[in-house]
Regions:
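Cytoplasm-facing juxtamembrane segments at the starts of transmembrane helices
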Residues: 39-47, 98-99, 122-132
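Functional transmembrane core segments of multi-pass inner-membrane proteins
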Residues: 48-94
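Intramembrane alpha-helical segments
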Residues: 1-63
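Cytosolic, membrane-interface loops and tails of multi-pass inner-membrane proteins
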Residues: 85-125
């Protein structure tokens, strides 16, 4: 609601074009969060577009008053980063929330056996998520430093 209110103020004071971004953003939030239209917008691809690419396109347009190749490339990069995060986090979240029991083992070629449990299965994707989060903070800081 706050973003929509700010968008309306910006649309009135700056440019009517912002209303397109405000309307689309409002629809994305409603359709995704409420599962409208048979959950067609509640997918990994829509998540990546809605929370990765779309904010980049919106903020780029607000700052440049145009969308160009740089905006598209930045949006695609953020789409892919968000999709990566979603790909890693979905199975981890599923194991944490829904698994009652996880057991098994991996037998290596040298005869060694590694025990599988929920913690060992989610350890690698969780570490990747932590590193991805840290990378985004450093990337954002670098972009900010570049602009200052």
């Amino acid at each position: 609601a706050g973003a929509v209110a700010l968008g309306i103020v910006a649309g009135i004071s700056e440019s009517r074009w912002i209303f397109a971004f405000v309307a689309f953003g409002g629809l994305i939030v409603a359709f995704y969060n409420l599962g409208l239209w048979n959950n067609r917008f509640h997918t990994d691809l829509w998540f990546a577009f809605s929370w990765g690419a779309f904010p980049v396109l919106t903020s780029y347009w607000v700052n440049a008053s145009r969308l160009d190749l740089a905006a598209v490339l930045l949006a695609v990069g953020c789409f892919l980063l968000t999709l990566t995060q979603r790909t890693l986090s979905t199975p981890v979240r599923s194991i944490r929330r829904r698994a009652i029991k996880v057991e098994g083992e991996i037998q290596l070629a040298n005869g060694e056996r590694l025990t599988l449990d929920s913690e060992s299965i989610i350890a690698v994707p969780e570490r990747a998520l932590l590193l991805l989060g840290a990378a985004m903070v450093v990337l954002a800081a670098g972009l900010l430093a570049f602009r200052l």
